[in-house]
Amino acid sequence: MIDEIQLEAEEHMTASVEHTREQLLTIRTGRANPAMFNGLVAEYYGVPTPITQMATISVPEPRMLLIKPYEQSVMNEIENAIRNSDLGVNPTNDGQVLRVTIPQLTEERRRDMVKMAKSKGEDGKIAIRNIRRRAMEQLKKLQKDGDAGEDEVIAAEKEMEKITSGYIEQVDKLVANKEEELMEV
């Protein structure tokens, strides 16, 4: 039973680290990255639809993205969604494709992006700590119900702390890498 609790907690922590990694990918750096459009939606026949499902996004140059909609009729919706987002980019429409040139980030904008990355990292660490807390509560309940001895629960709690520290360290590394990437000129 203790092993099941630890295994479940680890699965949830792994998912939290992955979610944090995906969140960090959406933060714009000075380079073109199709992942920056993850989570961006546009109207598609009245239904909010992710842009990544409405068009192919390619990177022909290090600082340019090419967005080719599957249907020309949604070109303006995609263009407006990008323009109205907080990404700080301005697409140009040539009738066939949207070209998005990624401007160099100013020092101030880089600092803002680093703050955003740290915030997303902190959210990930909070999620991991909440998972640990729930697992600890389950362990205490096992002890209270008499399904596990005190020594077993104490050992499991120590192991849970080690596991949690490892996952928090992973999130810290992700944030540090993103920060380094952002501050690189």
UniProtKB/Swiss-Prot annotation:
Kindly list the GO molecular function terms attached to this UniProt entry.
ribosomal large subunit binding
Q: Where in the cell is it found?
A: Cytoplasm
Does the keyword field hold Protein biosynthesis?
yes
Keyword Protein biosynthesis part of the UniProt annotation = yes
User: What SUPFAM superfamilies does UniProt report for this protein, alphabetically?
Assistant: Ribosome recycling factor, RRF
Q: Where is it mainly found?
A: cytoplasm
Keywords recorded for this protein, A-Z: Cytoplasm, Protein biosynthesis
Q: What processes does the entry annotate via GO biological process terms?
A: translational termination
One Pfam family from the UniProt entry? RRF
Task: Return the GO cellular component terms, semicolon-separated.
Answer: cytoplasm
Tell me the InterPro entries matching this sequence. Ribosome_recyc_fac, Ribosome_recyc_fac_dom, RRF_sf
Highest taxon above the source species:
Bacteria
Cited function: Responsible for the release of ribosomes from messenger RNA at the termination of protein biosynthesis. May increase the efficiency of translation by recycling ribosomes from one round of translation to another.
Family label? Belongs to the RRF family.
Q: Mind telling me what this protein is named? A: Ribosome-recycling factor
To which species is this protein native? Answer: Corynebacterium aurimucosum (strain ATCC 700975 / DSM 44827 / CIP 107346 / CN-1) (Corynebacterium nigricans)
Name the gene behind this protein: frr
